[in-house]
Amino acid sequence: MRSQLTEDMHTVQQMLKKQPSLLRKLTNVAEIKDFEPASALQYLNQQMQKDFPALDTTDYEIRYVHESMEDFLSPAFYLTPPLDTGSPNVIYINRAGSRSNLELFTTLSHEGFPGHLYQTVFFGKTQPDDIRYLITSGGYVEGWATYVESYGYQYAASLLSDKAAADITALMWKNRSINLCIYSLLDTGIHLSLIHISEPTRLALI
């Protein structure tokens, strides 16, 4: 993680050195015009086929979190279907909070295509032994969805009108990756190395 963090920070420094305007664009992210979650998932499903094996027609639906639960749930989540039916494949979107539609687009890449929805349906089509459904790993499942977020940022570039769209989305992903590395280093430092959160100097050396 340290090497990934160092590499990402170096890349960001080089990008901002060559294009200082990217920093302003990063904080004032361009919006995707005519954005709709359903069309975004269709677009992601189409785009991912150049990087991942295509699925047969996959039925899914979008639902919205009830307002009574908006303050307690994630911005979006994929609801894993029952084992014996494999359906419905449902993505819930939380309309609470303020986020750009570009952020929602990349969140849908995490939850939908090529993220959790794709991961679950593809896995089911491999006809795994039943025991594989009993043994699961949150790190494995979330690791995949986080990994493919980088593709979501790439796919979003063609939907932005800015000439530097590819660089903007690449910088956004690097920023996301840096944050994930920092969170992970703090997590392992505090819970594995038992560094107390009140020891900022030691935490900084993780």
For each predicted feature, which ranges?
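Acidic/histidine-enriched alpha-helical segments
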Residues: 11-18, 61-62, 164-178
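Catalytic Zn2+-binding segment of zinc metalloproteases
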Residues: 112-126
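Single conserved hydrophobic/aromatic residue that forms the stacking wall/gate
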Residues: 195-206
